[in-house]
Amino acid sequence: MAKRVRVGQIVNTQGVRGQVRLWPLTEKPSRFNEIKRVFVEAPPQGAPEVLTITSAHPLKKLVIVSFQEISDMTQAERLKGCYLTIPVEEVPAPEPDSYYHFQLEGLSVFTEAGERLGQIEEILETGSNDVYVVRQASPPGEVLIPALKSVVLKVDLAAGTMTVRLPDGLR
């Protein structure tokens, strides 16, 4: 099965014509106007696995989405809580020196001296910059690494590695 990336989560219905309120998992919610087909991750019994987007428009922090296959509130209700995904090949290329979270999660993190710190387990979105949660095997625990150009020296997606310069006192 091809790898898929989550692009949003259906949080509620909208109106009686089958529209849904979608929490976007993308920095640019306007992309839902470009996406034509989404997959429902673990769809409920009898719900469609593939949906065709017919319209999408922003509403505060959400996106109101209509699907060709969903025509009433009862059908839309069954999709509450479901994640929508697209094939990784359909994800637009990021800006230069930028990465999507799914590309960074799981990378092995090394110091500039070559010491293995661990693996990126999670990415926290804070106000000013992201923070990488790096799970350590020895000693057991985690290191929180700020996603700053002064800290992250190199990302090699092909090798599955990230090289960092730890700020003083981070350990």
From Swiss-Prot:
Signal peptide: none
Ranges for domain PRC barrel: 96-170
Database matches in InterPro entries: PRC_barrel-like_sf, PRC_RimM, RimM, RimM_N, RimM_N_sf, Transl_B-barrel_sf
Subcellular location: Cytoplasm
CC terms in the record's Gene Ontology section: cytoplasm; ribosome
Record-level Gene Ontology MF annotations: ribosome binding
Listed Pfam families: PRC_RimM, RimM
Primary localization: cytoplasm
Entry remark concerning the domains of this protein: The PRC barrel domain binds ribosomal protein uS19.
Subunit structure: Binds ribosomal protein uS19.
Protein name stated in the entry: Ribosome maturation factor RimM
Native organism: Heliobacterium modesticaldum (strain ATCC 51547 / Ice1)
Phylogenetic lineage: Bacteria, Bacillati, Bacillota, Clostridia, Eubacteriales
